[in-house]
Amino acid sequence: MNLAIDVASGEKPLEELVSGAISALQENKDINLILVGNEKNISKAISKTKYDHNRIDIRHTDEIIDMNESPANGIKHKKNASVLLAARLVREKEADGFFSPGNTGATLAAALTEIGRLKGVMRPPLISTLPKLNGEFCMLDMGANVDCTTDYIVQFAVMGRVFAKRYLKIDNPRVGLLNIGEEDSKGNANTKKSFERLQKMKKINFIGNIEPNDMLKSDSVDVVVADGFDGNIVLKTIEGTASFVVNLLKEEVKKNPVSVMGGLMMKPVFNNLKSKMSSDSYGSAILLGLNGGAFVGHGKTSGVGMKNAVLNMYKFLDAKINEKIAKELYDSGAKRRIF
């Protein structure tokens, strides 16, 4: 499997990202990498690592869409930007999927313009896995579509169900609609209408509304469906809360000598908690419903995050989730009505 990796974007040094990507090769012998960025810098970075020359290719470009740059402006004026070149490799069938830890808007735009949507998909959503007490659940949309119609939400539910079955290996995933209360009558006009539509879909194990405070419980839900505005807020709140709690505990521990002694023994627990909630642990969010794999990383993606992103790319593509989505949308009656 060939994976195109934009190592020129993001906030971490190129050398760290290259090292992380190459470390994934040691764990999966079926992965080949196409590293996109400045050839001289990439060659220098990989010369410091042990790797199989036959499994790594380099595609040179000096153009980068900066983190604070307008995605539309970058896509228009930088035709050979690293993220565009990586996505183009998927379109041209040289790669099965691409990953970028750079400008999120530019990554989404590159995926849509270069790879394109599956027939029947109205709006590709961003999906990601998140930890809960006894495992994982997935949530979509995480920010690709801020304004969503009921039709979009219904499609997200179908796509999320496919993802949970094939990626998380859950036979009959429970699908919940993110809302401000569990009652059927809760929510705005769009969530109420979405609730009614989802309740009528026999192929979906719809459990009703799910409140944000219930998502992380051990036995609550497997797929959380939301519009991109609410989904992105929930994601960032979870990440921020996890970091806050860990830092708060550390500050409390420092207040007296006895706590310091206990804190030293608890340090592995604190680090494990922080690691589980870190964006590096799940590597990337995935843009579903495309004619190829598109994976969006956090700007702060580290070498560890890059390694996990590459391994998760393989897991997703090997499960042929996008191919299954096209069939499920048609079978469920949630396909796009006008092509």
From Swiss-Prot:
Pfam families, A to Z: FA_synthesis
Keyword Lipid biosynthesis applies: yes
GO BP terms in the entry: fatty acid biosynthetic process; phospholipid biosynthetic process
Reactions that this protein is recorded to catalyse: a fatty acyl-[ACP] + phosphate = an acyl phosphate + holo-[ACP]
Pathway assigned in UniProt: Lipid metabolism; phospholipid metabolism
SUPFAM superfamilies: Isocitrate/Isopropylmalate dehydrogenase-like
Enzyme class: transferase
Record-level GO cellular component terms: cytoplasm
Keywords: Cytoplasm, Lipid biosynthesis, Lipid metabolism, Phospholipid biosynthesis, Phospholipid metabolism, Transferase
Keyword Transferase carried by entry: yes
NCBIfam families named among the record's database cross-references: plsX (TIGR00182)
Subunit structure: Homodimer. Probably interacts with PlsY.
Annotated family: Belongs to the PlsX family.
PANTHER family in UniProt: FATTY ACID/PHOSPHOLIPID SYNTHESIS PROTEIN PLSX, PHOSPHATE ACYLTRANSFERASE
Cited function: Catalyzes the reversible formation of acyl-phosphate (acyl-PO(4)) from acyl-[acyl-carrier-protein] (acyl-ACP). This enzyme utilizes acyl-ACP as fatty acyl donor, but not acyl-CoA.
Protein name: Phosphate acyltransferase
Natural source organism: Brachyspira hyodysenteriae (strain ATCC 49526 / WA1)
Gene name for this UniProt entry: plsX
